[in-house]
C-alpha cells in the first residue's frame, strides 16, 4: 500500500522534472534570440562575441558547447576572423565526433531524459549537413588566408562527408531505432482491463495531418549540398596541379549542373574544366574571371508545434495530452539578387546556386518519422504517469502529473541558425580598372570592391536580412 508521504515524494519528483525542463528551455532560447538579432542586423563581431561566451569561451579547461561553437565560427568568418573561426570549428569537429561515439551510459541517460522530460536536457546532436558545412567554412577560411594546403584538406573532407552522408545517416537512424525500440515495446504492451491503453497509430496520424508541407518540399537527392560541391569544384579547377584535381572539379561541377541546369556560371565552369582535361585549353591562357558568391538571407529556424491528441486516443482518465514537435520556419532573403557593374556598364547579376532551406528540409524530412515516434512514446510514457498518479492520488495526483506533462512537453528547437537561406553565384569578366560595383534593389549603399591584380578572383558577399549592409571578402588566384 502506498503511503501519503510516498505519493508526496512522487509529486515532488514530477515537480523537479518540470522545473529542470523549464530551466533548460527558457535560458538558451533567450540567448539564441539575442544572437539571432545581432547576426541578422549584420553586427557579426558582436554576434561572435555572444556565441563564444555562450559556448564557454576558448579556454581549454572547459569543453565548449557544440551548437554555440557552430554559431560562433560562422559569425567569425563573416567578421573576417578566419584563423579564429577555424580554431572554433576545429573544436566543434571534436565535439561532433564525441557525440557520434558517446558512451553507452550517456546514451542510456539521454534515452531516459528524452522520454520522461524532453531532448532539451540532452546535448545538441549535430546533423549531417552540420558536418559538411563545418568543413566548407573551414575551407573558405583557408582560402581567404591564402592557405592552399589546408583549403585543399578541408574541401576533400567536405566532399568525403558528402559521399559518406547516406551511410552516416543510416547509422544515425539505426541508433535512433535502437533508442526507441525498448520504449516502443513497453508502450505497445497489452494493458489491463479498464487500464491505460493509448492508440499510438492514430496519434501519429494526427501528427502528420499537422505537417502537410512535408509532401510539398523539393528536397535534394542523397544529401547533396550544391554549395559545397560548387566550391569544391571551383577550388580544384582554379588550384589544380594535375588532371586528378581537374577530375575532382569535373565530378563536383557535374553534380551541381544536374541540379542547376540553367545556371550560366555552372555551365561555363563545366565547359572550362572539360577543355582543361582534354588539353584543348590551358589554365594560364584562360580569360581572367571573377566569381561573386552571395550568401543571401538566413536559413530555417525551428519553432514548436503543439499537436493536441484527442483524449479518446489516450484514455478518459488523462487530464492533458499533446505532442510537442519541431517545425521548420523559413526566413526571408536579404535581397533578391546582386547586380554587378563596371562603372555604369552592367556585367551581370547573381542567380541561385543552392538553397540551404532545401538542404535542411532534406534531412528534416528523412528524420521526421523518428521524431514523431519519439514524441509519441514520450507522450505515452507521461500519460502512463498521469494515469498512475490519478489512480494513486486521485484528482490532485492527476492534476500534478498533468502539470508535469505540460511543463515537460517541449520541442527541441536547436538548429544552426547562422547558415544562409540560399547561395547565389555570378561569373563575370573583371572590369579593366579592377573596380567592381555591387548593387541590389533595396540596398541603400552599393559596395565598391577593389579586385586584386590576379587572373582569378572570388568575391564572397554576405547579407543576412533585408536592409542590412552586405559584407564582402576576397580571395585571388
Q: Language-model segments: which ranges?
A:
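Bacterial Sec signal peptide processing site at the extreme N-terminus
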Residues: 22-43
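Structural motif corresponding to the intra-repeat A-B loop/turn of tetratricopeptide repeats
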Residues: 41, 79, 145, 239-243
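Inward-facing hydrophobic residues that define packing positions of alpha-helical scaffold repeats
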Residues: 51-52, 89, 96, 155, ...
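Glycine- and small hydrophobic-rich membrane-insertion segments that are intrinsically disordered
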Residues: 103-116, 180-210, 273, 285, ...
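C-terminal soluble interaction/assembly domains
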Residues: 369, 382-477
